[in-house]
Amino acid sequence: MIVALGADLVEIARVERLLSRHGERALRRLFHEEEVAYALARQNPFPSLAARLAAKEAFQKCWPESLSWKEVWVGMEGKRPALRFAPRIEARMAEEGLFAHLSLSHERSHALAVVVLEARARGGG
């Protein structure tokens, strides 16, 4: 059963400006090491970083309490992006039988993330 839906759209140039202005400090504050490594392996890291920022915001719209930037991040499962969580969020997701589906997309100027939070039977899916 779908419990929540979150979507967010981020302007790629805004992320580029933010990082050019605040550099390494902003990268460390906003993104998990796994996200930074993935993005920096690309010729242009900004669309990937913008999509990951959108994913964090989209998940926050599904979650009932505030989160820090690094409590949720995007990792890869093969070629598919997947949300990863800090231990306290992971534990609560498991306790409540929740699973987060993630879809990312980006075009020339914007990155989009959609998160669907699904309640599953405890133990599977």
From Swiss-Prot:
Catalytic activity reported: apo-[ACP] + CoA = holo-[ACP] + adenosine 3',5'-bisphosphate + H(+)
Cofactor: Mg(2+)
Annotated Gene Ontology cellular component terms: cytoplasm
One Pfam family matching this protein: ACPS
Predominant localisation class: cytoplasm
UniProt GO BP: fatty acid biosynthetic process
EC number: 2.7.8.7
Subcellular compartments: Cytoplasm
Chaperone keyword on record: no
Keywords linked to the UniProt accession: Cytoplasm, Fatty acid biosynthesis, Fatty acid metabolism, Lipid biosynthesis, Lipid metabolism, Magnesium, Metal-binding, Transferase
InterPro entries to which the protein is assigned, alphabetical: 4-PPantetheinyl_Trfase_dom, 4-PPantetheinyl_Trfase_dom_sf, ACPS, Ppantetheine-prot_Trfase_dom
Molecular-function annotations in GO: holo-[acyl-carrier-protein] synthase activity; magnesium ion binding
Binding site for Mg(2+): 8, 57
Gene3D superfamilies reported in the protein's UniProt record: 4'-phosphopantetheinyl transferase domain
Function: Transfers the 4'-phosphopantetheine moiety from coenzyme A to a Ser of acyl-carrier-protein.
Family stated for the protein in its record: Belongs to the P-Pant transferase superfamily. AcpS family.
NCBIfam families in UniProt: pantethn_trn (TIGR00556), PRK14662.1 (NF011256)
Protein name, per record: Holo-[acyl-carrier-protein] synthase
Gene name linked to the record: acpS
